[in-house]
Swiss-Prot record:
The gene is N. Residues 422-470, 501-523 are annotated as: Disordered. This is Nucleoprotein. Residues 1-36, 373-391 are annotated as: Homomultimerization. Residues 447-456 have a biased composition (Basic and acidic residues). It is found in: Virion; Host cytoplasm. It comes from Canine distemper virus (strain Onderstepoort) (CDV). The keyword Cytoplasm does not apply.
Length: 523
């Protein structure tokens, strides 16, 4: 039997691994299309600033074709380095495109103020043809046209510091678009604006250089359409991360934005590990999870084998991304989402409307968090050197804190858990709701929220862990023979809570405190 389990583990790991690169054949290359990328031909700030001005205008032209737009965006993205040409040649390895670098220098004879560098030949007319939209469009009207601030005529500067701030403002907006351009382009506007405000408050960008919605939509759509552009952006991020020593300020900003880009599209996998496995609740011992836990283990190993490109597999359209979807481990994912909803309010906005979502295991995760609140793991306590008395103190404090948090919580909470088994479901359907709320301004009794203290099948409490605090959970006494008995039980528990509060007030001596029993309160 041990050999069977070992073979099963090896089988699942082998099945989830991608094929190894081998064989006598070379790399498969597709039919390439040429992309023209403009780079400054000198180190002058005027040249870079003028080139940036012309490129920003070209991006907003709706008639521009896709490959030309991709080349323009690559030119803008590489303007912050000292040698853009060397950077592009070093990191570009795309089987779908062929990059053609063209140097640009100032010219007094061309209408656009720039020309293509050549050995003796004049290419002013070709440069004017390339930048013809500039002269026929917004430049003739005396405005840049693609900024929200319509008072800005152009973005040409002759100072290196001003150019860096201007370029950082434009690059930040492009990089922010990458975070959700592939996964959620239709709902990305709000998060993109929040991040822009963040960098504005940090003085990394200037708010006056905010591009308008039309310009941003064009860039976002191109990022979503063109895999070659995304490959370049990911390669640029990785190249910046690898570079030693202090990095330029724009490079540090790109790394900061990368925190929003990394692992885009892998939320199901990452959250399942975070809430389903790292929390280490006893529910992981269920037989239903054994197969999916092995799947998660093999996926984590595959993630590590993919190396530095693993967090960008969705952005790079890697075919292995489907293995990481929640459909490969639906029960464990549903359970993890239930845990996450209870632990973090931010999880309440997640969309769980998927065909493989299992409500029963979602409620299992919720119930595990509620029933485990205030407990201290014996294994972790032993590792940290926490004594039994300290664990008891932590349990009491955590129970009271969790109770206050539960009352103030605004996330999706279920008022009554009918859970996994039909016996409980039938009883719950026959009984009235056990949660009653009264306003303080209204007459009558106030009934608190009650939680049952039943244990799930297969759940073994940790005997070395601290027990729940009585101030958090009270034993709910429900009788099946009528509503009057239920009301009496709730009134008795409410009175018991009031007496407990009175006894815990300052100045009350423990020696003179009367002892009350549940039977006396129920009579």
């Amino acid at each position: 039997m041990a050999s069977l389990l070992k073979s099963l583990t090896l089988f699942k790991r082998t099945r989830d691994q991608p094929p190894l690169a081998s064989g006598s054949g070379g790399a498969i290359r597709g039919i390439k299309h040429v992309i023209i990328v403009l780079i400054p031909g000198d180190s002058s700030i005027v040249t870079r600033s003028r080139l940036l001005d012309r490129l920003v205008r070209l991006v907003g032209d709706p008639k521009i074709n896709g490959p030309k737009l991709t080349g323009i965006l690559i030119s803008i993205l590489s303007l912050f380095v000292e040698s853009p040409g060397q950077l592009i040649q070093r990191i570009i390895d795309d089987p779908d495109v062929s990059i053609k670098l063209v140097e640009v220098i100032p010219s007094i004879n061309s209408a656009c103020g720039l020309t293509f560098a050549s050995r003796g030949a004049s290419l002013d007319s070709e440069a004017d043809e390339f930048f013809k939209i500039v002269d026929e469009g917004s430049k003739a009207q005396g405005q840049l046209g693609w900024l929200e601030n319509k008072d800005i005529v152009d973005i040409e500067v002759d100072n290196a510091e001003q150019f860096n701030i201007l370029l950082a403002s434009i690059l930040a907006q492009i990089w922010i678009l990458l975070a959700k351009a592939v996964t959620a382009p239709d709902t990305a506007a709000d998060s993109e604006m929040r991040r822009w405000i963040k960098y504005t408050q940090q003085r990394r960008v200037v708010g006056e250089f905010r591009m308008n919605k039309i310009w941003l939509d064009i860039v976002r759509n191109r990022i979503a359409e063109d895999l070659s552009l995304r490959r370049f952006m990911v390669a640029l991020i990785l190249d910046i991360k690898r570079s030693p020593g202090n990095k330029p300020r724009i490079a540090e900003m790109i790394c900061d934005i990368d925190n929003y880009i990394v692992e885009a599209g892998l939320a199901s996998f990452i959250l399942t590990i975070k809430f389903g496995i790292e929390t280490m609740y006893p529910a992981l011992g269920l037989h239903e999870f054994s197969g999916e836990l092995t799947t998660i283990e093999s996926l984590m190993m595959l993630y590590q084998q993919m190396g530095e490109t693993a967090p960008y597999m969705v952005i790079l359209e890697n075919s292995v991304q489907n293995k990481f979807s929640a459909g490969s481990y639906p029960l464990l994912w549903s359970y993890a989402m239930g845990v996450g909803v209870e632990l973090e309010n931010s999880m309440g906005g997640l969309n769980f409307g998927r065909s493989y979502f299992d409500p029963a295991y979602f409620r299992l995760g919720q119930e595990m968090v509620r029933r485990s609140a205030g407990k201290v793991s014996s294994a972790l306590a032993a590792e940290l050197g926490i004594t039994k008395e300290e664990a008891q103190l932590v349990s009491e404090i955590a129970s009271k804190t969790t109770e206050d948090r539960t009352i103030r919580a605004t996330g999706p909470k279920q008022s009554q858990i009918t859970f996994l088994h039909s016996e409980r479901s039938e009883v719950a359907n026959q009984q009235p709701p056990t949660i009653n709320k009264r306003s303080e301004n209204q007459g009558g009794d106030k009934y608190p929220i009650h939680f049952s203290d039943e244990r799930l099948p297969g759940y073994t409490p940790d005997v070395n862990s601290s027990e729940w605090s009585e101030s958090r959970y009270d034993t709910q006494i429900i009788q099946d023979d009528g509503n009057d008995d239920d009301r009496k039980s709730m009134e008795a528990i409410a009175k018991m809570r009031m007496l407990t509060k009175m006894l815990s007030q300052p100045g009350t001596s423990e020696d003179n405190s009367p002892v009350y029993s549940d039977k006396e309160l129920l009579n």
